[in-house]
């Protein structure tokens, strides 16, 4: 998981303080554990195809589980995805898709609330893809709540150097919500626009040269 998290941070341009939930929400990646479980279920489902070498070996629940296997772990979960006579190629593809859909839905349901919104993170508008990488990285940082554009964050990592007050109005904390509520820089935009209207936010924050 550590190498994957580091790669996602690099791809997004986020800070080391950024939580795992934000990284996976932004990149739409399953965690390593979730992905491995999904692949294990899909592999076990493949043994239910008529042409598979293990198809002729029926599953029999052990009287006592001494050691977990794919069968003891996932048999109950995939029972509805195959027939006793075995799956053909079309049925197998449908089963693989169902396992993938279930894994993604479970990951989304288990995701922690976004730290800025205190709610599940909504979908990011496709319009963000039109922005340069530097602007998209800053927007992702702001959605995480940890950004070098925020005095609160800079004060947290270098307490004796940076002041947590807003450089425009002098109030604290200078965090992501404050950017849209600063009396010295009024706007009709709000925090949700970081997701729904990233182009307008990038323009408001002068992120695009």
Report residues per predicted region:
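Short cysteine/histidine-rich zinc-coordinating motifs and their immediately flanking basic loops
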Residues: 177-183, 193-197
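Secreted/processed peptides and extracellular or luminal domains of membrane proteins
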Residues: 172-175, 188
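Intrinsically disordered linkers and flanking regulatory tails adjacent to Zn-binding modules
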Residues: 194-208
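Helix/loop segments that flank and initiate small ligand/metal-binding modules
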Residues: 82-172, 197-200
């Amino acid at each position: 998981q550590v190498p994957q998290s580091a790669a996602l941070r690099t791809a997004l341009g986020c800070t080391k303080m950024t939580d795992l939930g934000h990284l996976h929400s932004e990149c739409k990646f399953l965690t390593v554990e979730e992905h491995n479980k999904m692949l294990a279920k899909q592999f076990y489902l493949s043994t239910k195809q008529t042409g598979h070498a293990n198809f002729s070996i029926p599953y029999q629940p052990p009287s006592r589980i001494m050691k977990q296997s794919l069968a003891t772990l996932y048999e109950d979960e995939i029972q509805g995805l195959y027939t006793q006579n075995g799956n053909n190629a079309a049925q197998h593809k449908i089963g693989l898709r169902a396992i993938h859909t279930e894994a993604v839905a479970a990951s989304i349901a288990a995701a922690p609330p976004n730290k800025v919104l205190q709610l599940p993170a909504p979908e990011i508008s496709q319009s963000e893809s039109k922005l340069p990488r530097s602007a998209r990285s800053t927007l992702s940082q702001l959605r995480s709540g940890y950004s070098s554009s925020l005095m609160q964050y800079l004060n947290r990592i270098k307490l004796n150097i940076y002041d947590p007050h807003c450089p425009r109005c002098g109030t604290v904390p200078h965090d992501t919500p404050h950017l849209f509520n600063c009396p010295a820089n009024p706007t009709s935009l709000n925090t949700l626009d970081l997701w729904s209207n990233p182009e307008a936010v990038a323009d408001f924050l002068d992120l695009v040269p």
